[in-house]
């Protein structure tokens, strides 16, 4: 389940997750939990502590396994979203998740992410805050019950 107030973005893999007929070699696709709510003006910020927070709280239940998740602040929205098409730029997220999955250690991943976030390509397109959280299942399928190693 996802919950959000205001702008920022929650993105997750659009694969069927439990669909055994899905092509494992198909390019990844991503879904947006909610379109960002910028309020009346671009710089409007909504807070959970506001009296009218319930009017702006959005909740989404996704009844399937999610293997890739990204949460970001509004500073990266223009790079990550196709505003005209009201959808996610898959090509923004796919390389990020490939890097996370292939990362051999925390130091390498940190250097790679910092290099991307502070790159000329990113900085030319935003002057706002840039916060990005990436989470992925390294092992996509974990059995519901594991064999007892003592047996």
Go through the PLM ranges and name each one.
Residues 1-15:
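Conserved catalytic micro-motifs used in adenylation/nucleotidyl-transfer and phosphoryl/amide-
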Residues 5-6, 36-37, 74, 150:
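Secondary-structure transition/turn motif
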